[in-house]
Amino acid sequence: MACVAAGLLLAGAATEPSATAAKKKNKGSVKKEAFGKTKDGKAVEAYTLVNKNGFKARIITYGAMLTEMHVPDKDGILGDVVLGHDNLESYLDGHPYFGVTTGRVANRIAKGKFILDGKEYTLAINNDPNHLHGGTEGIDKKVWSARVSRSKAGPAVAFSYTSPDGEEGYPGSLKMKVTYTLTNDDELR
């Protein structure tokens, strides 16, 4: 049930020095680097996708979160258009859901309760008196696994996370997968 903002269509083509090599290869690239550690010591990584035109997107394994998207302005100069932070610590101290994958449910569940198959479930309350975007420790606050993949469309990274039975009060385990692809047509999907 993970929601991801997708289908961002970008116009124009520009490059910056760090993207020139990827453009020459005509297929794009994915760069992995350390982004910090959670309070319980889990390593968080950043994956930067660069397409053949030099467009860039960065996604971190914490919340499968989009933290950067570089697109050209009217003069062809690339700039980051994503609201967010430059470091993990700022996300760990609380964030307004910038660029995250939310779930198990996006939006509010009134009073943190729902009935499924005749049984009432009580969820974590994090938007008094409601449950919002998966709860206090929702999937936006989990470290996801990541795997680099490539397709004809452009460079991609697949993120996966399994929410165990009972996490934040939800019944059943749920396997989730989110794939970010930066197409060579300058779309992030």
Per-region residue spans from a language model:
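Surface-exposed acidic/polar loop and edge beta-strand patches at domain peripheries
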Residues: A19-R189
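Bacterial N-terminal signal peptides
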Residues: A2-G12
